[in-house]
């Protein structure tokens, strides 16, 4: 407690005197101001995203909170060689003293400064083994009796646990959240708290948090001012036309989203289960507590989108989406910009309408992120062994 108080006093004094903060001297800056030295009380490590200065954001679905963690990982680097780990689930299990069915890789995120790869992992602490639902993203399966672990993948492919004991961090509690004992009402049987946070992204001074709330429009996109501050949360309840379900929906959460621009204006490109793709203009979102998005594609029912990234090739921008029950999909940004709204149901199951996509080989892709302009890092399930592999795939494959 004494050390924490001293650090907070020095940070405050530096601010008053207009001096660089201690964190700036060690490589940090304004984004670390107001953080506390200690051990973040993360109950369940879920989705992750990186912000400026190498700050890691980690969603805590069970605790209904988001943590900002300074990993002190700010040395610029470029990865030019593939980093492949065959059987990464077995190696993680051995490292954490359990078996492969006793862990879940909830998310994968790349620090864009250092290009180090980080994994959000759950280790089961109660009965051994998770109950995987084959067509559902693993992040939905975080159990209440699992311990969060943060893993770093080195440039040489080694796995290192990142101790979250003495780190600089800050915490933002989410409003209108479900409690861990909230009733189960999903078709797939997951508790509502497991959907409190489904995806994160940092956008121009705000952390966007997709998921559910206990509001009338349960599907919610929260926007947290960062550095976190009291009263720094804005929320918008979202409605989207679900072509396969033949209705407008307000309870289905965004599964994955991408900050994007259409004709120079910022939007959120959001993908939902079963699988509508919708656009939400950010300027409109900031002015409304509830809003209806524009559905621009139906990518096929019985499927769950997992991750979405953007990349450029030959001067053109594309979107890459990984899925549970479909191949990976490549969509042209130009087609998204030209897309018309879809307001009528599909005529048959599994039909696709709206924006077209190119199917990309990559069955079993569970986690996906852009490593740099050369590589995409993917964790996929091996269809022969059933195990998990992590591979870095050249960008020109897509």
Model feature map: region roles:
Residues 1-6:
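N-terminal secretory signal peptides that target proteins for export/translocation
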Residues 8-21:
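Bacterial N-terminal signal peptides
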Residues 26-398:
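Sequence/structural signature of beta-propeller domains
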């Amino acid at each position: 407690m004494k050390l924490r108080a001293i650090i907070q006093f020095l940070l405050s004094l530096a601010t008053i005197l207009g001096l660089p903060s201690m964190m700036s001297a060690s490589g940090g800056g304004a984004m670390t101001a107001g953080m506390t030295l200690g051990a973040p009380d993360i109950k369940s490590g879920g989705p992750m995203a990186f912000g400026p200065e190498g700050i890691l954001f980690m969603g805590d679905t069970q605790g209904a909170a988001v943590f900002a963690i300074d990993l002190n990982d700010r040395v610029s680097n470029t990865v030019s060689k593939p980093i492949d780990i065959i059987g990464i689930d077995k190696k993680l299990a051995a490292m954490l003293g359990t078996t492969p069915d006793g862990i879940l890789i909830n998310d994968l995120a790349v620090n864009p400064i250092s290009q180090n790869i980080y994994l959000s992992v759950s280790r089961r602490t109660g009965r051994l083994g998770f109950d995987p639902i084959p067509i559902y993203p693993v992040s939905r399966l975080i159990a209440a009796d699992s311990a969060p672990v943060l893993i770093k993948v080195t440039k040489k492919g080694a796995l290192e646990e990142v101790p979250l004991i003495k780190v600089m961090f800050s915490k933002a509690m989410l409003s209108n959240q479900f409690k861990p004992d909230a009733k189960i009402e999903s078709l797939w049987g997951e508790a509502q708290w497991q959907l409190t946070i489904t995806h994160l992204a940092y956008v121009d001074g705000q952390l966007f948090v997709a998921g559910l709330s206990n509001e009338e429009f349960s599907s919610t996109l929260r926007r947290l001012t960062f550095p976190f501050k009291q009263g720094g949360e804005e929320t918008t309840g979202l409605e989207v036309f679900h072509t396969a379900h033949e209705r407008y929906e307000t309870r289905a959460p965004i599964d994955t989203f991408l900050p994007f621009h259409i004709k120079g204006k910022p939007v959120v490109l959001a993908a939902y289960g079963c699988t509508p793709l919708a656009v939400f203009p950010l300027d409109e979102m900031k002015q409304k507590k509830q809003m209806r998005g524009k559905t621009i594609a139906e990518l096929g029912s019985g499927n769950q989108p997992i991750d979405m990234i953007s990349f450029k090739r030959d001067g053109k921008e594309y979107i890459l989406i990984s899925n549970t029950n479909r191949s990976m999909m490549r969509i042209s940004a130009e087609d998204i910009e030209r897309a018309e709204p879809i307001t009528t149901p599909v005529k048959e199951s599994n039909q696709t309408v709206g924006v077209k996509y190119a199917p990309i080989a990559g069955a079993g892709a569970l986690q996906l992120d852009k490593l740099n302009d050369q590589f995409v890092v993917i964790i996929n399930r091996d269809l022969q062994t059933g195990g998990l592999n992590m591979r870095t795939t050249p960008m020109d494959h897509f």
